[in-house]
Amino acid sequence: MIIERIRLRNFLSHSDSDIYFDTGINMIIGQNGAGKSSIVDAIRFALFSDKRTRRTEDMIKKGERYMEVELYFRSEGHSYRIRRTIERRGKSISTDAEIERDGSIITRGASDVSNYVEKNVLNINKDVFLTSIFVRQGEMDALVSKDPAERKKILDEILNIDRLEAGYLLLKEVIDDLTANVSDYDYLKNELQSKINEIDNNNKQIEELESKLRLIEPEIKALEEEINIKENKKDHLNEELHRLNAQLETIKKYEMELAESQSRKASIEMEVVKLPSIEEELKRLENNAAVVKRNEIIEYINLKKDLGSLSEIIEGLKSDLSKYDEAHRKLEDLQSFRSEFLEKKKRKEDLDKLRSSLKEDEDNYQSAVRNIENIKKWIENEEKEIERMSAFISEILKIQEITPEIINSRRAEINSSLMQIEGKIASLNASIDAMRSHKMEVEENAAMLSGRGVCPVCGTHLGTEKSEDLVKHYGEEASRLEEDINKTENEIKKLDEERKHQKKLLDRINGKDVERLIASYNLLSSKRAELKKFMDDEARLKEAHLKAEAAISQYNSIDLGDLEAKNEEWLKANAVISSIDIENIRSRFEEKNKQLNDIIKRMNEIEVNIPDVESYNENSLKRIDEELNSLRNKKNELYAKKAAMDEIQKTIEHFKEEISKKKGIEDSQAEVNAQLLQINDDLKQLSSRLDKINVDQYEWKSLHKVLLQDNEKLNIAVADIRKRLEKKETIIKAIADLKRVREAFSKDGVPAIIRKSASEFITNQTRQYIQRFELDIDDVDVDQDFNITVFRGGIAEGIDSLSGGERMAVAFALRVAIAQFLNKDVSLLVMDEPTAFLDEDRRSDLANIIEYSLKDSSGIPQVIMISHHRELLSASDLALEVKKRNGSSIVDVIR
């Protein structure tokens, strides 16, 4: 993996830093707090979303809402770009990420990108990668300066052996928890056997009950069949008894109907004896003249009615003829008045049409006249009010001329001025924050240096004079910053006063008085346009107005008073004539007179034939008809009763024959009842026996069901216990496996293997690097407990026997060897403050070691170092310097 470029926007102290790296030694130097380590933090953040801050949003530069990091690197022939962002959105935080390979997006999302980097790009565990390529501050010195126990602890942490030992302790807790979980294993086995024994006992009882139930089934079946036979016979006897009872009921009915029929026959015989007298009276009435000459009498009555109706019609026709003659004379007398009326009415209607056609224009004209007068008055009043308000507002705003355009222009100027002031204040506040932050860093550094003479970051001895110069420099820098802060705060106060003044002016311009004035101007302009429209309408409609006035004058001069009354009389006379069809009336008058004469002639003929015809009327004829019909109906009724009496006699004979069978039916009924009594006794005995057997069967079946249900529950319990036992057995097996795994995690297990492998590899790699350094050391050995032994002239010596430079060389070789052990293909090494706690000579030695061992070497293609000491610049291929300017970190290429 080779890092080519990293871009930081609003990341920690970096506003916008775009940093390019190269192969070889990349040195990043700068004062404490300049933002050097932020670059390393950004690399870790881009790769794995790692952060050193407590909260994610704390990585966003103070005063900003958005942060972005872009990392460009090469790995295994591919070019990659990772982009991560954090954004404040109100109270929430939004994060995003994406990874691009050879120009194509591979995946998005913070966790997905991290997983892809670990599994598809680096192909090693994140922790192993970070441990192998990132050398922490003071880590190299600790490898040779600490005592053996502490050195072993440091190496265990680097190689993750400490995690195996922690796993060894954790596995004991897990095993103890699992052992407690299987403490009831024997109890469950005993409980299982108890349940199985209970099921076996239940099964024995079930077999006995099933045997009893099988034996009792044939007896129940035989009893049920015998009962069914008896029940069927009982049903047949009941049917026969029902039939006999029905026959007896029918005979009882016949006995009652016989008495009734005999009574009816006697009653009819008493009525039939009246038949001869009724026939004689009917014959006498049928020979009466009112019956024999009935049609002529009815004709005479109808002609008499028609005679009266014709007389009324003829009188009406005479009246219509008289009305017609009188109306005709009146029409001739009024004709001249009628003609004069129509002529004047036509003239008046024409004038009215003209007036109606001009009505809309006349109404519009009158409306325009009224509106002109009203608007002129309104404009006059509004101009006075605008003049008054303009004088008042002009005095307040200090503007000579007041118009809506001038007011809006002034408002825009004030808003623009306010925005500029707000921007300046925000910028100055940000500058104050940056200066205060810088001042705090300077004061902290001065406080840490004062009286100690040691660099607070790396522990370098500065000497009294250099320390005092640096403290003095920090004091001067703090004073200058305080002075700049005060000046900036005064500038902010002036800007704030101006802002208040401009806001006051804006409030006045946005006030109700100004708004009313603008509204009045706009309304006045609208009213003036409206006035012009109405004045144009008045001029356009003037001619129509004059025509309308002339038409109204002529219309009012025409008087139809007397002529209208004469015309009404003419219309009434004409209506009478129009309503009378004179020719039809004259024709009908002649026709009705002829009909009248014909009726009188026919009535005279009937009176000659029937002298007493006048004595008859409709009521007398009706009475005769009613009497005649009554006699005829009685005659027919008596003949019908005589025929019915013969039928009744036949029915009486039939009833007597059926009643004679009653004795035989009653004997059969008694015999059937006796048989039913015997069958009921038999059924009672059989049912009693069956009920007793059924009770036994029900009790056995109930017990059988209870035992089956009990077995079902027991089987469920057995299955549950077996499952629990299987789980327990799995756990017991797991405990045994975990014990074996824990044994592997013990100090004599995997950790010992790793230490052995690591010690061999680290010894070989360290030996190779030591040989390059051309030191007075023949060999070096690192044992499994990470004790370091060096050899001079074949004599073994401890690490403490080495000079400062030699110790630094061994420490550097060890750390590079460890990195290569963790990651065989390590192509990048990032060292954060490797000079920490080193004196000037040892820093110089480290520079030489780096130059001889890493520069232009194919072992580790790229090294990135962070330091605030410039002694290492000589060993670099690319040098970058980080400085703080106005609270932001700036990165410059210096070599």
From Swiss-Prot:
Residues 411-507 form the Zinc-hook domain. Residues 183-253, 464-510, 618-647 form a coiled coil. Keywords: ATP-binding, Coiled coil, DNA damage, DNA repair, Hydrolase, Metal-binding, Nucleotide-binding, Zinc. Belongs to the SMC family. RAD50 subfamily. The two conserved Cys that bind zinc constitute the zinc-hook, which separates the large intramolecular coiled coil regions. The 2 Cys residues coordinate one molecule of zinc with the help of the 2 Cys residues of the zinc-hook of another Rad50 molecule, thereby forming a V-shaped homodimer. NCBIfam families: PRK01156.1. This is DNA double-strand break repair Rad50 ATPase.
